[in-house]
């Protein structure tokens, strides 16, 4: 049995996790960084278009931009679901965060004067997104990873965290399975940070990497003490490349690309008269699905799609600013975007809900646990995230989370008195694995996970109704019961993908149920949560955040609610000139 002892353990080595590890180290903590994959393979690597910050570098296109404008657009974009104290903190910090990443070596695009160049993005009226062509996440992650290596932080990868260690209401570390050997390892920590990314793979059509399965959310939820916030707030990105669902960045439309239907008509102005192709993502995704429902999509073997047209931008602009988009479309769809339109359809993209934390990234309900990035709900994005705010969120949350966790760790005692709790959790997880190994394989975890993902896509998608959600919940509950009968054909614990999936799948269904149950109970439409049977926003009854708690003896979560923090901007019109989608009872 291996037991490691650190001041701070960070689970997840994407941008949020690496930035948290760097800041904890700066504050004097002994830090371990644990990852499923080699850090530079983390999903942050896939972020393309840019990072929002009010630098005002673009002359008339960004004139007068400051944190207040960034704050305003973020709150409006969230459909007043974000905590405004968090939004204020992040938008004020954004220029400093970006300049620090520039200092660390991020190769941002430059203006003729040598300033960091910024591009237009959806849901704003100024050019605010700093970018490195269309591989911004890749560039930022490499810069952060260099800092991690320079700091000498201990990195453990090919490690899957399967549970938290609790002593009463205090998190004292986590149990990790070494995916190469199958050994269980205890990482003890005075402060434990979860930065495990989103849960996109609970959907069958997602831009997310296959590692984005909600691991951090499920192990926090499984404590029964930590709530998941606003899990019904799921973002669908307008331009997933059909039919492989790889992201084509919003920067395509920020740089002048347009969406067209089967007749070649640029339809977005029919739905969002003020912003057109650069309305917020929830508006654009609903508009695209409305076009498809109206029969103006193109039929294909994997369902209907629409067109993203970049052909008028020219080869020089595409190859200098959208090179990855060009290569992705060529390699995965056989499309040359210089001369051909790319087939696209809205697809799951971002988990706006997550582990509920306070403004300093401390998880609600327990001591010693923190969360940052897409797995957290602190709550920067509310019910719709603006493009470019995710990279900012990961870095800002990582900074504050790492600092808070390190400072708190100084005031906590060593783990020597917690050995009984550590041994108890190790024994529990060993028993769980032994049960899977000894059980007859009546059910297959991978097949059940695939069924779950199809249910989520068809019943908890862009357009939602009470009847469809209820049907989806009933199907998910059936799967949750069946998952208890899963057994393994392969009995070796090391390098056993079947075991990895079997350990993860129950938590994935729990997260899916939190999404679906939150959606059926929220009888309004707000941001990305669109109820066709309740199509209007209801500030009188629903200007709040859903909190989902695990219940003993019930697979459905217990729901509670808390008020959203409003400091400067009271609820009002979002300013997109949105036209309501046509009414229909069809489910997506």
PLM feature segments, named:
Residues 30-35, 230:
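Short beta-strand "acidic-cap" motif of Rossmann-like dinucleotide-binding folds
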Residues 219, 226-336, 343, 404, ...:
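An anion/pyrophosphate-binding glycine-rich loop and adjacent beta-alpha core
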Residues 191-246, 278, 300, 387-404:
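Glycine-rich loop(s) and the adjacent beta-strand/alpha-helix scaffold that form part
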Residues 53-90:
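Glycine-rich active-site loop/strand segments that organize a redox cofactor
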Residues 12-15:
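Glycine-rich Rossmann-fold phosphate-binding loop(s) that bind the pyrophosphate
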Residues 1-6, 20-23, 27, 38-40, ...:
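Glycine- and aromatic-enriched mobile tails/lids
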Residues 82-92, 128-146, 156, 206-214, ...:
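Short beta-strand to alpha-helix junction loop
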Residues 97, 102-183, 188, 195, ...:
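Conserved redox-cofactor binding core of oxidoreductases
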């Amino acid at each position: 049995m291996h037991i490691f002892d650190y001041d701070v353990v960070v689970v997840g080595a994407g941008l949020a996790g690496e930035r948290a590890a760097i800041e904890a180290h700066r504050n004097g903590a002994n830090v371990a960084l644990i990852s499923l994959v080699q850090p530079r393979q983390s999903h942050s690597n896939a972020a393309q278009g840019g990072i929002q910050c009010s630098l005002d570098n673009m002359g008339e296109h960004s004139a007068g931009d400051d944190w207040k404008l960034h704050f305003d657009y973020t709150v409006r974009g969230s459909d007043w679901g974000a905590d405004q104290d968090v939004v204020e903190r992040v938008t004020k910090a954004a220029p400093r965060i970006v300049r620090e990443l520039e200092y660390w070596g991020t190769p941002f695009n430059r203006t003729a004067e040598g300033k960091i160049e910024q591009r237009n993005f959806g849901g704003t009226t100024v050019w605010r997104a700093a970018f490195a062509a269309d591989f911004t996440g890749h560039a930022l992650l490499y810069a952060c990873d260099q800092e991690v290596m320079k700091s000498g932080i201990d990195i453990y990868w090919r490690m899957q965290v399967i549970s938290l260690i609790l002593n009463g209401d205090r998190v004292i570390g986590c149990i990790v399975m070494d995916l190469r050997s199958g050994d269980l390892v205890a990482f003890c920590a005075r402060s434990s940070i979860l930065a495990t990314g989103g849960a996109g793979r609970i959907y069958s059509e997602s831009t997310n990497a296959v590692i984005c399965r909600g691991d951090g959310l499920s192990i926090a939820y499984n404590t029964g003490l930590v709530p998941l916030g606003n899990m019904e707030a799921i973002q669908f990105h307008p331009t997933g490349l059909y039919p492989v669902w790889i992201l084509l960045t919003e920067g395509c439309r920020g740089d002048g690309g347009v969406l067209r239907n089967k007749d070649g008509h640029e339809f977005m102005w029919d739905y969002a008269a003020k912003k057109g192709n650069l309305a917020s993502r929830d508006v654009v995704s609903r508009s695209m699905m409305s076009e498809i429902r109206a029969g103006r999509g193109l039929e294909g073997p994997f369902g209907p799609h629409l067109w993203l047209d970049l052909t008028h931008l020219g080869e020089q602009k595409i190859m200098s600013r959208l090179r990855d988009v060009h290569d992705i479309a060529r390699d995965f769809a056989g499309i040359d975007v210089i001369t051909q339109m790319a087939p696209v359809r809205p697809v799951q993209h971002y988990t706006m809900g997550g582990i509920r934390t306070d403004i300093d990234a401390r998880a609600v309900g327990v001591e010693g646990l923190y969360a940052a990035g897409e797995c957290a709900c602190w709550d920067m994005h509310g019910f719709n995230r603006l493009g470019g705010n995710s990279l900012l969120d990961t870095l800002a949350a990582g900074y504050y989370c790492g600092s808070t966790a390190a400072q708190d760790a100084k005031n906590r005692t060593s783990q020597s008195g917690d050995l009984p709790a550590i041994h108890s959790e190790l024994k529990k997880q060993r028993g769980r694995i032994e049960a899977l190994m000894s059980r007859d394989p009546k059910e297959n975890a991978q097949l059940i996970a695939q069924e779950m993902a199809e249910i989520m896509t068809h019943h908890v998608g862009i357009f939602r109704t009470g009847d469809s959600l209820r049907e989806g919940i009933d199907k998910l509950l059936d799967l949750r019961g069946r998952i208890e009968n899963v057994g393994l054909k392969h009995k070796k614990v090391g390098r056993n993908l079947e075991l990895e999936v079997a350990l993860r799948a129950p938590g994935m269904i729990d997260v899916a149920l939190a999404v679906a149950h939150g959606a059926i109970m929220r009888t309004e439409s707000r941001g990305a949560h669109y109820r066709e049977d309740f199509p209007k926003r209801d500030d009188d009854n629903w200007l709040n955040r859903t909190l989902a708690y695990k219940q003993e003896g019930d697979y459905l979560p217990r729901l509670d609610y808390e008020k959203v923090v409003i400091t400067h901007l009271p609820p009002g019109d979002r300013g997109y000139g949105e036209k309501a989608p046509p009414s229909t009872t069809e489910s997506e």
